[in-house]
């Protein structure tokens, strides 16, 4: 709850976006983002039922929030990155956007574990850029690994909380001319898992703009099961 309102994900019925947006406004809420047929909205709790049943609204529920994986680094030597560094290849002229749920403590590491200067941007609703340094140190750890591997690269620390925030961050990164997007994030059970869906579309959009997207994989390999669906 923030300022008496809760964040929600509104799925728009076909052809109903104008009506859905009007319902949100009439309830005293606001729309802060959009992705496909979904709107990211803030609403008074008392208005949730009315908006959920309004014209133009197919569904209303909790946002698709990001989940964080563990961060483990075996260091530069294990990757033989030090050999590249010795050859003068240290990431000069490369811009890397690290998209994460928070970069707590990053300020204290500037000039040591991180470059002396970084670009920060916060895409979480209602949060200023200063609150990039909050919530979790997961993104800070990821940025440190990137800096270890490419110490001369320029880093962009972009904070998100939802799938729609992520889409906005990707758009920003492309507009800033970044060369690499790095994510170590998970969204559980919100895409088909077959290389299609909203996240695949984001990655394709970045790739078409000449951006390499590097992402963590396999963190949940022993924590899930899949099989053919059967009606019990």
Enumerate the language-model features and the residues they cover.
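Autoinhibitory N-terminal propeptides
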Residues: 1-136, 145-148, 154
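Substrate-binding/access-modulating region of protease and related hydrolase catalytic domains
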Residues: 137-143, 153-232
């Amino acid at each position: 709850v923030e300022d008496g309102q809760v964040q929600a994900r509104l799925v728009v019925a076909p052809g109903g976006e104008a009506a859905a947006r009007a319902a949100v406004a009439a309830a005293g809420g606001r729309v802060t983002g959009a992705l496909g047929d979904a709107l990211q909205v803030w609403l008074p709790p008392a208005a949730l039922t009315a908006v959920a049943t309004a014209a133009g609204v197919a569904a209303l529920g909790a946002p698709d929030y990001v989940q964080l994986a563990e961060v483990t680094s075996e260091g530069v030597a294990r990757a033989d990155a030090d050999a590249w560094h010795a050859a003068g290849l240290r990431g000069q002229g490369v811009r890397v956007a690290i998209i994460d749920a928070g970069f707590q403590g990053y300020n204290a590491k500037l000039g040591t574990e991180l470059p002396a200067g970084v670009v920060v941007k916060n895409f979480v609703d209602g949060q200023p850029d200063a609150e990039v340094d909050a919530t979790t140190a997961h993104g800070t750890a990821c940025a440190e690994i990137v800096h270890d591997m490419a110490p001369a690269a320029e880093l962009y620390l972009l904070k998100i909380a939802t799938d729609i925030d992520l889409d906005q961050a990707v758009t920003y990164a492309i507009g800033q001319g970044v060369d690499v997007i790095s994510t170590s994030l998970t969204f559980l059970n919100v895409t088909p898992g077959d290389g299609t869906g909203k996240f695949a579309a984001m990655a394709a959009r970045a790739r078409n703009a000449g951006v390499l997207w590097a992402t963590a994989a396999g963190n949940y390999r022993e924590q899930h099961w899949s099989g053919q669906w059967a009606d019990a």
